[in-house]
Design a protein with these regions (language model features):
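Hydrophobic membrane-embedded alpha-helices
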Residues: 2-220
Length: 220
């Protein structure tokens, strides 16, 4: 709550005075935009109004909050699921296993929803903004957490710590960063490739960097 809500309120308070200096089409439906921000429903607001992340025809001041909306949906719903599993599991290892399996299943469903959906629609805005189709990177993070550990370091991280020297560790991190840079410059939101493989590659690159950073933390 304290990490998300106060910055969102501050963002709206700081942004609104500047609306006096921009074109009126930016503030059209501003009430709905603000409601979407505070309700963490900006992604659905953009879908209902026909918005596009790169659109110059329907500019919205808070369009970037679509990703925060997806994040909050994940935190609330997945948090409840993990809480329920924690009450049913008999050990931490059993809980980790159940979280891993459910995260994998949710990742597969979400990814293929975007993959198949992007082949069936004329405008990709719906699959781009939808929580169902764009939540799979968070489940990759859940999978990674069960593999590398959160409070306690897993055996996998310890193994990488033993087998990787500092140079190899940094190279793995740099490889993930390079993939993200290449995707940034060469893949646009209008490309079908972005929805079929681009976002997946970006997510895998980010996971690789997180893993490398975790191993590097153990080394230092």
């Amino acid at each position: 709550f304290y990490r998300i809500v106060p910055p969102v309120v501050l963002m709206v308070l700081v942004t609104m005075p500047f609306t006096l200096l921009v074109r009126q089409d930016y503030v059209a439906g501003i009430g709905g935009q603000i409601a979407g921000v505070f309700g963490f429903m900006t992604n659905f607001y953009e879908m209902l109004t026909g918005g596009s992340y790169e659109s110059q025809f329907i500019p919205h001041l808070f369009v970037h909050n679509w990703s925060l909306a997806v994040e909050v949906h994940y935190y609330i719903l997945w948090g409840l699921v993990v809480w329920f599993l924690s009450k049913r599991s008999k050990s931490s290892s059993q809980l980790r296993g159940m979280v891993f399996l459910l995260s994998t299943g949710a990742f597969i469903i979400s990814f293929f929803s975007m993959f198949i959906g992007s082949l069936m629609v004329s405008s990709h805005s719906s699959v781009y903004f939808s929580s169902l189709t764009h939540v799979y990177p968070f489940f990759l993070g859940s999978i990674l957490a069960t593999v590398v550990g959160v409070r306690q370091t897993s055996d996998l991280v310890k193994q990488f710590d033993r087998t990787w020297d500092l140079r190899q560790n940094l190279l793995v991190f740099a490889a993930g960063l390079l993939v993200l840079v290449l995707l940034t410059f060469f893949v646009k939101f209008t490309y079908l490739f972005a929805y079929l493989f681009g976002f997946l590659l970006a997510s895998l690159a980010a996971v690789t960097m997180i893993l490398a950073a975790r191993v590097l933390h153990e080394k230092t």
